[in-house]
């Protein structure tokens, strides 16, 4: 459930993966 609050500053590298998961 990281996409719920998508903390970009918490993990920038995961931010790109999180965006792809949110699109799905």
UniProtKB/Swiss-Prot annotation:
Question: What's a BP term from Gene Ontology annotated to this protein?
Answer: translation
Q: One GO MF term, please?
A: rRNA binding
Do the record's keywords include tRNA-binding? no
Instruction: Answer whether the UniProt record assigns the keyword Glycosyltransferase to this protein.
Output: no
- Give the start-end ranges of region Disordered: 1-24
Keywords, ordered alphabetically: Ribonucleoprotein, Ribosomal protein, RNA-binding, rRNA-binding
Tell me the function of this protein: Protein S19 forms a complex with S13 that binds strongly to the 16S ribosomal RNA.
| Name of the molecule in the record | Small ribosomal subunit protein uS19
Q: Which organism is the protein's source?
A: Phytoplasma sp. (strain STRAWB2)
The opening ranks of the lineage are: Bacteria, Bacillati, Mycoplasmatota, Mollicutes, Acholeplasmatales
């Amino acid at each position: 459930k990281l996409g719920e609050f998508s903390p970009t500053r918490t993990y920038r590298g995961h931010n790109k993966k999180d965006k792809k998961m949110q699109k799905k």
